[in-house]
Regions:
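Exposed, flexible binding/inhibitory loops of compact, secreted disulfide-stabilized domains
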Residues: 2-139
């Protein structure tokens, strides 16, 4: 029993994954970003350019880039309604941040609008200077 507790303590001490809180800025089936991409935006200039591409003519949400950054996933074009992307979790391991996201697809039996959609999810997180990796979660 004592050995098991020691092994668990050593394992947990080496496991530095820490969940990162995030707040949704924008999430819908519509974006003017037509290509699939994942982004980590760290400057006001990058944010202005991305927002202008994503939602031209719409008010740009304020982000304090001295404290925060924006992370986003754009799926690119989909041939019908019913697609969605969701950032489901963000974890930090030292200087590396891993963003997990999931694409939700319509069921074969769903009745769908025949319209091209561009699903996206943009979130605000605490600023980091480390690498940001993206991992697509499988269903």
């Amino acid at each position: 029993m004592v050995a098991a507790v020691i092994v668990l303590a050593v394992f947990l001490a080496g496991n530095r994954l820490a969940p990162v809180q995030f707040t949704t800025i924008s999430q819908s089936e519509q974006s003017s970003v037509e290509d699939a991409r994942q982004v980590a935006v760290r400057t006001p200039e990058e944010w202005k350019a991305l927002w202008k591409e994503h939602a031209p003519g719409q008010p740009m949400p304020a982000v304090d880039f001295t404290k925060s950054m924006v992370i986003g996933v754009f799926l690119g074009s989909r041939n019908t309604a019913g697609y969605r992307v969701a950032i489901t979790g963000i974890e930090r391991d030292g200087a590396i941040v891993t963003v997990t996201y999931r694409e939700e697809r319509p069921a074969a039996r769903d009745i769908l609008a025949q319209v091209i959609t561009f699903p996206h999810h943009l979130v605000r997180v605490e600023r980091t200077v480390g690498e940001v990796k993206f991992a697509r979660a499988e269903r």
